[in-house]
Each structure stands twice: as C-alpha cells, then as structure tokens.
A protein has these predicted regions:
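Core catalytic alpha/beta fold that binds nucleotide/phospho-ligands
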Residues: 1-259
Length: 259
C-alpha cells in the first residue's frame, strides 16, 4: 500500500512528469485534471514494482469494469497476481495492492473535513438508519463529524472492493457497525452487515492513519485471510515518482482498526 503527497514539487511539474507515463487516450481523458493524472501515473509506478516483467511503468495497462472499477490488464503475470484500488484527497494519493489476485477497495479522506453544520441531516440522507442513530449518540460535535468521515471512508472502500460503486450499492442499503476500544488510539473494529451479500466473500476492513501528524484517514477493504482476519497490511510512503519507503507505527503508520 502506498501514499504520495505532492509537497516537494509543484502540481504542474508533477503533471508534466505524469503525462509521460499515460497513454494518449488517457491524456485526453484526464486533460485539466492534474490530480487524477498524477494518481493514474503513480498507480503505474507502484504496480510495476510487483512484477519483474514490467520494465517500465508504461508497460502496466488497465481495464475497467461495467461500473468503472479498474483492474490490471497487462502484463499478464501482474494481472494474475495483483488486485488494486486508488483514491486521492487533498494532495494524498493512496494505492492499495493485493499480491494474491484478490479484489480490494481503498478510500482516503480528511477526517477533519466538515460537510456542513448538521452532520445528522447529511447522515439521514446517505447512511442507514442504524448508522445514523449511532452517530446521533455521539455527543461531541467534532467527534461525531470525525466518526462520520471514518464511516463514509469505510463504506466507500467496500463498494469499491465489490466493484459495485455507490450507484450499484447505495450507502443506505447496508450497515457498517463499529465499536471503539478504550485504548489511546480509540481503535475501531468494524462489522459489515449487507443483506444482499451472499457471504461468499468475507470482507474485512482496516482503518488507518498513514501518518499520525496528518488528518488523512484511509479505509482498506479486502477479503479475509485464511485465519478469517484482515490480511497483513504493509504501509509504504513516497513522494511522487520517488522510491517507496516502509512506514511503521513508531514513525506514524498508525492503525485505527483491522477486523
């Protein structure tokens, strides 16, 4: 898993470098959207590291499902081995990669983002009744707003992992129940309740802060491992087009939850 933040160079310079890593069709598609252009190129540079047949980031090509979910088209060895998902928010791009071919979904948001003065009104429109009720039980406004953003991020990661997207699986039609541990990190544990899910894919979640000093929060959704738990999550960090660096908890790779 990798994150990138464009603090060390101008967006225009990053976009110029990114253009060299996308196809002509992609340049046309992404014209005027530097963030998506950089994210697309960054995904290629991350994915190529997982396959020895990819000599250049441009060797990595993508296919898209009926609802827009991306997958690796080539090289064939990479397509068979890796599933991936991409999200970006306020200068941070997150790329999730599985190395066993499983699907995954990732979403990143600023947990300090405020959607308006009335979180409850927004929740009633978009979330399930149980989720809205649980949010309303949180007394402190800031804590309730942060909980909303974490929940939204988790739900987004699920619909991306499933390939359905928000249009195919409206947020109001499934629940994510959560508990908050009494530890210093206020660790969340989450349980998906989707009545249309046939149970063939036991989805698990990891809710992460890639760096403790920043307000971004990421949710990763992927199938459970052999032990029924979330597979091991490895967090890596990079500036755009630079080598990836492993991040451990002591250096800011803080994990909110994995369950």
């Amino acid at each position: 898993r990798a994150g990138t933040r464009g603090d060390d160079a101008s967006e225009n310079e990053l976009a110029r470098r990114a253009e060299a890593l996308v196809s002509e069709d992609e340049r046309t598609e992404l014209m005027g959207n530097a963030t998506r252009l950089i994210s697309r190129a960054f995904a290629r540079t991350v994915l190529m590291r997982y396959d020895e047949d990819a000599r250049d980031a441009r060797d990595v090509t993508f296919a898209y499902g009926a609802r827009g979910k991306p997958s690796v088209r080539g090289p064939a060895t990479l397509a068979a081995r890796c599933g991936f998902s991409v999200s970006h928010c306020d200068g941070l791009t997150a790329v999730a990669v599985t190395t066993n071919g499983d699907a995954c979904g990732i979403d990143v948001e600023d947990e300090n983002r405020r959607i308006g003065t009335d979180v409850g009104k927004f929740a009633r429109r978009w979330l399930s009744d149980d989720e809205t009720r649980r949010l309303s039980d949180i007394v402190a406004d800031d804590e309730r707003a942060r909980a909303f953003m974490r929940l939204w991020t988790a739900k987004e990661s699920y619909v991306k992992a499933s390939g359905l997207g928000i249009a195919g699986r409206p947020f109001r039609e499934f629940d994510i129940a959560w508990d908050v541990a009494e530890d210093a990190a206020k660790t969340w544990s989450m349980d998906l309740r989707d009545v249309t899910d046939d149970g063939t894919v036991p989805w698990r979640f990891a809710l992460l802060k890639p760096r403790a000093s920043q307000s971004h929060v990421m949710s990763l959704c992927a199938p459970a491992g052999a032990d029924g738990r979330m597979p091991r999550v490895r967090v890596r960090w990079a500036s755009p087009f630079e080598p990836l660096v492993d991040v451990d908890a002591a250096n800011g790779g803080v994990e909110y939850a994995a369950g």
